[in-house]
Each structure stands twice: as C-alpha cells, then as structure tokens.
Amino acid sequence: MNKELFYSELSKDLKKKFGTSVEKALPWQLHESLSATVMELIDSDWENSRKAHLDSRRACYLSMEFLMGRAVYNNLLCLGITDEVDELLKAHGRSLNDLEEIEDAALGNGGLGRLAACFLDSAAAHDLPLDGYGIRYKYGLFKQKIVDGFQKEEADNWTKYGDPWSKRCENDKVVVKYGDQTVYAVPYDMPVIGFGTKNVGTLRLWQAESVEDFDFAQFDCGNYDGAVKAKNDAENISKVLYPNDNCEEGKILRLKQEYFFSSASVTDILKKHLAKFGTLDNLGDYITIQLNDTHPVIAVPELIRQLCAEHSYDFDKAFEIAHKVFNYTNHTIMAEALEKWDCRLVEKVVPEVYTYILMINERFIKDMYALKKDREYISKLSPVGDGMVKMAFMAIYVSSYINGVAAIHTDILKKGALKDWYELYPERFQNKTNGITQRRWLALCNPELSALITKLLGNADWVKNLDELKKLEKYADDEAVLNEFMAVKEAQKNRLAAFVKEHDGVDIDPNTIFDIQIKRLHEYKRQFLNALSILYIYYGIKDGSIKDFTPTTFIFGAKSAPGYRRAKAIIKLIGEISKLVNADPDTKDLIKVVFVQNYNVSYAEKLVTAADVSEQISTAGTEASGTGNMKLMLNGAVTLGTYDGANVEIVQEAGEENNYIFGARVEELAEIMPKYDPREILFSNDKIKRVLDKLIDGSLSDGGVPSNEEGSFKELYKALTDGASWHVPDHYYVLGDLESYVQAKLKVNADYKDKLAFAKKCWLNIANAGKFSSDRTIKDYAENIWKIEPCLLYTSPSPRDRQKYRMPSSA
C-alpha cells in the first residue's frame, strides 16, 4: 500500500465532505472517509469480481438476516493493511481505536445472520462465486437497554451517520407488487472482501421505497397524514427485523418482508441472467439459490410465477427450472419455527403468488398418487393443508437438496421431524455442519492468540486453512507454551473487564473464572437453567454444602424478542439473582453475575476471547448446530454443554475429557418425556425445591406485580410445573437436567484450580477446531450442493499490492 497516496486520498475526502482534517475529524467522520478511501481502493477488483461471477455458475444466498458486524476492521484485515493504516493514523495523532464506537450494521439477530456473514466471508476468501441477498433494515432488531432489570427496546438507527460501506444502485431498483400496494425495492450493495485474494463478493440488500412519495392532492385537501401514507407504508416493510407477529398487522408485515426481498432478488437474478444469455432456459445451469431457513421460501412460487406470467413458460417447465435452482437449509426441528402461513393471509397479501402455491400443491398431490400414496399420507405432507401454507414442506418438495447443519441435527431430521420426506427423497438430504470464519473470530478479534499460533506454526497459513491448527497438539504438554497461552487469556480477560466497566458500569474481576453464555434468549437455549444453577450454587455456599468454590463471574448476553414474555422474564430473573448474590457478603467474593446490555457482534468479539467456560446448554435435540460454541472453542474455552447440535462434534474432535458434557441425551429424552413429571423432582429434591420456591415466595422481585395477579416469575414457575402455551410441564427438561448440570459446573470449578491442566484442555480445543471453519462448510456446499468452482481468472497479483496473509500485529 502506498501510504502517502492513501493519506492524501483520505485527507481529500475529509476536506471535501466535512471541511476537516485527519487530526480534527470526529470518529464517525474519520470512519466515513476511511471507508470511502478503501472503497476506492477495491473498486476495480469488485467490478472484475462481479463480471467473473456472472460469467460462472454462481450461488445466490437468500437470508432474512446478515449479521455482518463492524466492517472497517474486518475489511482492513482482509486487505492486509491494518498495521499500515494504524501507523498512518498514529502519525497524525489518531488510531484505529478511535473507531471503536462505530455502530454494527443492524441487519440480523442471532446465529442465522452470523452464519450467513461467515459464509460470504469464506466464499470471498476462496474465490467462490457466491453473493448474498437480504433486507437493508433501517432499525434492525432493536438496541437493548436494561432498566430496573427489564429489557427495554430502542430503535437502532445504525445509519444515522451514514452507511459508507454500501453503494446505492438506483439503476437496479425493481417493482414488488402486493395485493394492496406496489413498492420499489432499491438495492444497496456491500462488498465482501476476500482475504489474500482479489475476489470481492457482494451482499445486495433491498430497501423498500414508495412508488409515489407524496400525494399532493391529499395534502391540498388538508389530509396531511394521507399525503405521506403511501411513503410510510412502503418504508415500514424494511424498517425493522422481525416485527412482532402477535397480531394480524404484524403477521402481514412479516409476510410482506419475506416476499419483498424474495421477489426483488428473484427479479434481479432473472434480469442479470437474461442480459447475459438472452434466455432463461439454461437458468439452472448457471444459477443456484440457497434458501437460508424458511423465510425466503416464498421465492420458490415467486420464481415459478415470474417464469410463467412474465416470461411465458408453462407451469411444468417453470417447476423443472425451479427444482434445478433451489436448495433449502433447515435450521430447526422445532414445530413453531417451521413456518406456516394462514392461506387466507397469503391470498390477501400476495394473491398472484398464492395461485402458484396452489398449483405446486396440486402437482405434489398428482406426484404422490402416481407413487400410490394414500390420502392420509398426502394430507400429512402436502405443502398446503389445514388452511395453512407449510413453507418447509414446499421448500423440500421443490428443492434439489435439503441440508441440516450438524450431524445430530440432520440425523434427527431424517429419523423424526422430516422422516417421511427423507424416505420419499433420500437422495436430496445432506448434512453441512456449520462453521465460523477464523478471520473475524480469531485473526481479527484475538491478535495476541493469533500471533502466538503463527509463531508456533512458523506461518499464518491457518488464516485460510484452519486444519493447520492440528499441528498445535504437540505443544499440549509444553509448559512454556501453556504459560504463554494463559498470559494471552489473562490479557483478554483484563480487556473485557475494562470494556464491561465502560459499557455497563460493572466491575468484574479478571482473576475469576469467566463462565459465559451468549446467545439469543429462548427457552430451549436454557438461560433459565443457568440462572437456576447459580441460585443452587449460591445457597450451597451459604449452607456450607458447597466448599472451596473457585471465584467465578457468570456472564450473560442475550436479546429477547419484544413479544416473548417468558424470555423477558428470564432476563429480569438474571438481574434479580445478580442483585442477590453480588451484594451478599457471604458470596460476593465468590460469585458475580453480570448481564451485558445490547449484546452484538462487536461485543461478542470481546467476550469469546476472554471466556474460560463456554455455556452450550440447550435441551438435547433442540439446537440445530450453534456457532457460538465454535467461536468460544477456537479462542480457548472449554465447552460445558449438552450432547446437542455441534457440541457433539466438538467433543468428538477435541475429546470429551477436555470438555464437560452433562444431561439427558436425545435418545434418553425420547423415553423420558412421555411419562416425565417434573413435580416428582421438585418434591423429592430439597435443594431444587429451595431454588424454585424463590420464584414464588417473594424473595426475588419480578417488578412489583400485585399479589392478586400472576407475576412473570410465577409464570416461569408454572411453565415448569404445569406447562405453558401448548407445551407440557417443563417442556425443555430444565428440572430434569438441573442436578447433572450443577455437578458439571462444580467439576469445571474444581478442575480450574490446576491452572496448567485446565490450560491444556483449552489448548487442545484450539488445536482441534479446524473442522469448524466456515471455509470447510462453504467448500462442501460448493462441491456437493451448488456445483460451483473458484473464479481463478481473478486471483493473479493485485494492482493494489495486497500482501498475502499479512496479519495485524498484536501490539
């Protein structure tokens, strides 16, 4: 990189846009101009990559979420210019640390969106023609504040200072039609820079805009709200991720969102293909579309509709093309997450598409009759039935391939939730265990550990081939290396402690065990179990039954969906437990409970590097995969978890002896749950009863609800004893696993006393994390589902002098 030229361009941009200099610019101004300078640097490579992708068979990844995280640091890393840019800024009294408070792009919520981001990163790094399609949310999910222990949601206006990593592509805007309105979908393109290559992928995000911004006739008549109604109604479609669907209006808006980006993406794909080839007959030869969960499944009938209604194909030919093009990733076995839409609602919102959904269903029925299936079988599997459109079933019927995201998850799908479909189309089912990008989740977020690994291996090849970490196993008994690793971990714990103090105003002791659970708040992820276990340990310390407890800081980070009452009650419960144990003189030096606010990618980057213990405690058989477990493993935490999701493969790779597995397994739960009565545990185990009683005896405040009403903690209690919603009592086996979980927690606590032996366990987890790179996952998709190959034409040395595997220093 020519530093003088880079600085000149940066200075010019600051002067032109803001009338300021590098020395005087506000952080957001510096970020804006630095981004613009980098965008100029990659411009020719990005354009060449677009052309190369269009010349190749390419994959299009449709996802409701893309949780990209902060772009600036990752892009500098991938370009290999982090140190040079930081040195340049420091020469003028600034540094890259000045950009620490730049907002994350609020384009997702949890693992689904982060997985999509990792996939784009891996594809770009390995020259694979993969591009993403999603929604450019104005406010994302929400910004979380904890007020008096309660989650409060605020609008997350992440673009208030601009969005310098996006380009608005006005010429590519398309029209999306609903039953009651027509809107524009305007694309904003974000570059996905490949590490150590010239390849730059594209994430195309659609923003909803009104066809008519302002109705002057309405304004002239004094109807001022009516004058901007069309504009507001259109913009609402892309304002918020996952609008609350507890009401009819919320359901309509969510369906409109799903159709909005699915329709716009299909239109864009067809338009580009036609421009290149002049025909859609060969669409399946050049395009493959991956549906990330059920949200974009409406793209299936939409593609068929466009082929028939706008390009004159007959239905059967359009169906054949759709079958060649689409593939579907299933992310859950939970019935409530396998989307179903009321037929009445679908017909109302997208009447033209609904017609083709019915045609798909009719074809399915004919196919099944041809296979001599009976009515009961057909009714059970039909994409439309019981007044509902079953999105997962429609995806499975039309797609070429269906995949689960961890070995145990795929096995459960085949034997349980999708057993009939697997028996019908066994050749379509595959497993693709999820992965994470080591570039963001090690090279970027943990430069000290990265430097140690690179020193020991003699090179940084691991940044693009994580299997190289296996060579670290030989150092597992090297006391000097383990001491270096422990020093790195200590530095990261100090860094996190400083950030938590600044961000949340809470003091935490870096000399304690950092036991961390960070993930979306949901009952199946069992933050509730973790909270109850802390109470169990607290009372055990108080009564002397638990002795010699190693001081531990229990850290939670999670957001609850705004309308999810019990999840929000769990957040409040964690806060109340925190108040209790943190203030008690008997325990305050042994236990600290912290709930960090507004957990996001940037916060996660600090948490995963500092963790000693990774909490992965979902009920066996409910977590499809999980990726937080992989990030924490890669940074040297042991897994305390159930035999669920990717935990299974983590212990297979790193050894169960180097992790802590507890609780009932899938096959055991299949036998236990039909006759399970949690009250038997409650009334036979005094220690568990003591903990549960605190939810209803007034010891913990759930917000001062009058005694004649049912408070939120009592609702949590009754969910365990009597059941809640459509669930049986203790549906997620919290009480059933509690004793086993506490004992596993205490085993971790005792083992930590031998620091060197514990460090060895952590080190062996790092050394065996190679399988969990998203590079491996994406290559598997490319070879076995998408049938795409690297665009090797554009991997020659770059004119922008990118230095291969140039890692930032750990200073």
Please place each PLM-identified region on the residue numbering:
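A conserved ligand/cofactor-binding region detector
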Residues: 1-793
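Short hydrophobic/aromatic residue motifs in ordered secondary structure
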Residues: 615, 801-804
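Conserved small/polar residues in nucleotide/adenosyl-binding loops
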Residues: 794-801
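Hydrophobic alpha-helical segments, chiefly the membrane-spanning helices
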Residues: 805-811
